[in-house]
């Protein structure tokens, strides 16, 4: 798993780390039971404070996507599977929208309208 952040972004680093893990889960690259890289390793590779990565992992824990246990690290939970299925469904929706020559803005408007 490769976690990427943009130091120039206005989005806090911890939020970018959490979003990167979520994206891997949605893409199916993170499966239930998979271990996330250690917070220490991620912090070192990104050149950020360890507590920044721990905060990201805590956010993911609070969302139910990872389980954190002392000595085991952060492990993906079963909650990552529905996220991957949703991503697959969205890809299929986008493909159907393209076949209908629907613009991304029009599709987004339909989704927003339906979501209400």
Give the positions of each predicted feature:
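Short glycine/serine/threonine-biased micro-segments
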Residues: 26, 31, 62, 69-71
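Short, glycine/charged-enriched secondary-structure capping and boundary segments
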Residues: 52, 82-84
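Short, Lys/Arg-rich nucleic-acid/phosphate-binding segment
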Residues: 35-36, 65-75, 79
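Short, structured secondary-structure boundary patches
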Residues: 48, 54-57, 72-75, 88-95, ...
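N-proximal short alpha-helices
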Residues: 15, 59-63, 80
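Enrichment for repetitive, rod-forming helical segments
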Residues: 29, 42, 47, 62, ...
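N-terminal helix-turn-helix
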Residues: 35-66
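Extreme N-terminal segment that seeds HTH/winged-HTH DNA-binding domains in transcriptional regulators
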Residues: 1-35, 41, 84-116
């Amino acid at each position: 798993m490769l976690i990427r952040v943009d130091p120039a972004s206005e989005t806090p680093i911890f939020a970018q780390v959490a979003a990167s893990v979520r994206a891997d889960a949605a893409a199916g690259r993170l499966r239930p039971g998979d271990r996330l890289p250690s917070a220490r390793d991620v912090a070192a590779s990104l050149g950020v404070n360890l507590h920044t990565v721990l905060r990201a992992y805590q956010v993911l824990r609070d969302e139910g996507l990872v389980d954190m246990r002392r000595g085991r690290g952060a492990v993906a939970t079963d909650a990552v599977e529905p996220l991957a299925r949703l991503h697959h469904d969205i890809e299929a929706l986008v493909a159907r929208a393209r076949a209908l020559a629907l613009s991304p803005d029009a599709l987004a408007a339909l989704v927003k309208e339906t979501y209400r």
